[in-house]
């Protein structure tokens, strides 16, 4: 049985902690110095004990971290350690901060993780062109798979999707690479955003596209927003995803997820036909969609400007020019709104609706199309006038 901090110890530490903090929740370095120096350890050792116990690196010790520091000091004095350990033993890690320790170990290369697989750029038949954008139909399917496999905390483990892996024509090495990509902290489970991205990568790989090498920064940040359980009585689960079998069936498979959902009894599942742009979705995916729409509008505006430049030799129509300027101003305003949305300012900070932004963009798109139609009609009128002038010249 691993050692543990006894209840009597905790009570002793609490009396010291509460006396030093005057009922506060944190102990500063100045408040802790007299207690720690009474141990007789060297200053450099005490500095390392502090760094080891300050798991969240906020420069203070809460009560759990103070217990860790005191226990390490007592173990040093009792000869359990020859020197300050470089890492905390697992039994001494506060469960409420275990995720921070695991993330730190992942960043320093000390955590278990799937073997990194070299990119196989010469794999026959694989295509470039992976796109992070999820169509409404694909996202609906991903969410269905997520709902069938999430645990009570809304997270999904690697092993929970084993039946799905078996239904795909994707090698296990690529499956593990995709998991590593969306799980930078090497956790045993991933949240909803990471799960949807993981399924999206597998879908593209199933369709013959290469696994991407990096994840957009905005998505990577959403992967790390995992929900933490603070119930210390919960039994600890396995911290690492189990390595899948190295031999995955690679024969001809059904379309991504269909065979798997059929086995789950969901073959009759149909979407309501509602576009996801009208539903409340996660901010990161909404940003991708809005940026795509902005790019399409930019392309259309460029075509309109090009058409206007071609007809500058004739009589200038002031009405289309006025409409064009107004649309450009509206487009600049929408771009500013998108920047505010990304930075959490303005309407976004006050709870502004992403749906209203998407609706406004749709309105701009309709107006641009109307402007193009108007330009075409004016060009037809211009051509007619030119023909009449030529006919008049010939008649003379």
From Swiss-Prot:
The EF-hand domain, residue ranges: 41-76
Protein name (record): Actin cytoskeleton-regulatory complex protein end-3
Native organism: Neurospora crassa (strain ATCC 24698 / 74-OR23-1A / CBS 708.71 / DSM 1257 / FGSC 987)
Keywords from the UniProt entry: Actin-binding, Calcium, Cell membrane, Coiled coil, Cytoplasm, Cytoskeleton, Endocytosis, Endosome, Membrane, Metal-binding, Repeat
Family named by the database record: Belongs to the END3 family.
Protein's membrane topology: Peripheral membrane protein
Functional description taken from the UniProt entry: Component of the PAN1 actin cytoskeleton-regulatory complex required for the internalization of endosomes during actin-coupled endocytosis. The complex links the site of endocytosis to the cell membrane-associated actin cytoskeleton. Mediates uptake of external molecules and vacuolar degradation of plasma membrane proteins. Plays a role in the proper organization of the cell membrane-associated actin cytoskeleton and promotes its destabilization.
KW Metal-binding (keyword) present: yes
GO molecular function: actin binding; calcium ion binding
UniProt domain EH: residue ranges: 9-99, 138-226
Domain of life: Eukaryota
Organism phylogeny: Eukaryota, Fungi, Dikarya, Ascomycota, Pezizomycotina
Cellular component terms (Gene Ontology): actin cortical patch; cytoplasm; endosome membrane; plasma membrane
Keyword match Nucleotide-binding: no
A UniProt-annotated Pfam family: EH
PANTHER family named in the record: ACTIN CYTOSKELETON-REGULATORY COMPLEX PROTEIN END3, EH DOMAIN
Subunit structure: Component of the PAN1 actin cytoskeleton-regulatory complex.
Subcellular location: Cell membrane; Endosome membrane; Cytoplasm, Cytoskeleton, Actin patch
GO biological process: actin filament organization; endocytosis; endosomal transport
Stretches of the chain forming a coiled coil according to its record: 284-395
Amino acids binding Ca(2+): 54, 56, 58, 60, 65
Chief site of localization: membrane
Gene name in the database record: end-3
UniProt-listed SMART domains: EFh, EH
């Amino acid at each position: 049985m691993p050692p543990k901090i006894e209840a009597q110890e905790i009570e002793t530490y609490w009396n010291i902690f509460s006396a030093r903090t005057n009922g506060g929740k944190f102990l500063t370095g100045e408040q802790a110095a007299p207690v720690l120096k009474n141990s007789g350890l060297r200053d450099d050792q005490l500095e390392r004990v502090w760094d080891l116990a300050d798991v969240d690196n906020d420069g203070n010790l809460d009560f759990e971290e103070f217990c860790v520091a005191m226990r390490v000091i007592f173990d040093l004095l009792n000869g359990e350690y020859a020197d300050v350990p470089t890492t905390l033993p697992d039994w001494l890690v506060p469960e409420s901060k275990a995720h921070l320790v695991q993330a730190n170990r992942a960043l320093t290369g000390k955590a278990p993780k799937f073997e990194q697989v070299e990119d196989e750029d010469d794999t026959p038949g694989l295509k470039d062109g992976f796109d992070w954008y999820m169509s409404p139909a694909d996202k609906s399917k991903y969410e269905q798979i997520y709902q069938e496999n999430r645990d009570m905390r809304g997270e999904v483990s690697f092993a929970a999707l084993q039946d799905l892996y078996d239904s795909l024509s994707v090698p296990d090495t690529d499956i593990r690479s995709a998991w590593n990509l969306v799980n930078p902290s090497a956790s045993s489970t991933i949240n909803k955003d990471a799960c949807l991205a993981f399924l999206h990568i597998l879908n593209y790989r199933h369709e013959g596209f290469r696994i991407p090498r990096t994840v957009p920064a905005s998505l990577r940040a959403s992967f790390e927003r995992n929900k933490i359980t603070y119930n210390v009585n919960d039994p600890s689960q396995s911290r690492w995803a189990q390595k899948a079998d190295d031999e995955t069936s690679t024969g001809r498979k059904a379309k991504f997820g269909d065979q798997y959902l059929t086995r789950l009894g969901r073959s009759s599942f149909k979407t309501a036909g509602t576009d996801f742009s009208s539903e409340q979705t996660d901010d990161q995916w909404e940003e991708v969609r809005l940026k795509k729409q902005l790019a399409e509008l930019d392309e259309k505006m460029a075509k309109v400007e090009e058409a206007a430049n071609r007809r500058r030799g004739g009589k200038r129509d002031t009405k289309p020019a006025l409409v064009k300027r107004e649309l450009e101003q509206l487009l600049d305003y929408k771009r500013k709104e998108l920047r505010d949305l990304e930075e959490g300012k303005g309407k976004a900070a006050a709870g502004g609706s992403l749906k209203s932004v998407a609706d406004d963009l749709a309105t701009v798109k309709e107006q641009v199309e109307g402007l193009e139609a108007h330009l075409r009609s004016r060009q037809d009128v211009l051509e007619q006038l030119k023909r009449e002038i030529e006919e008049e010249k010939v008649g003379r």
